[in-house]
Amino acid sequence: MQLVALGLNHHTAPLAIREQLAFPAEQLADALRDLTGSQTAHEAAILSTCNRTEIYASARDIDSVLVWLARNRGLDVEVLRPYLYALDAEATARHAFRVASGLDSMVLGEAQ
């Protein structure tokens, strides 16, 4: 297992794509159970706002997370691929701190 992040945001995807990948609050618990129960990820967190959807996971590999995301949202992997970023362990940690501090937000410092 390795630490990975897979996501898209206001920099990488138009609103129409972001809306298709967004996880409503009432779906998050089931999505996390499915993600970790599918053997794709040992542990995971999903961050979903109007400006980003990101999956942080301890996973076998990033491609398995991508396949799970596409299946869960009912989309084709190849439709999603151009809009997504995939990060390795070091880049995942750096990115998580940028997001948490609001440095990667549409408006600097906001919580989205």
Residue ranges and their predicted role:
Residues M1-Q112:
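N-terminal ligand-binding/catalytic initiation module
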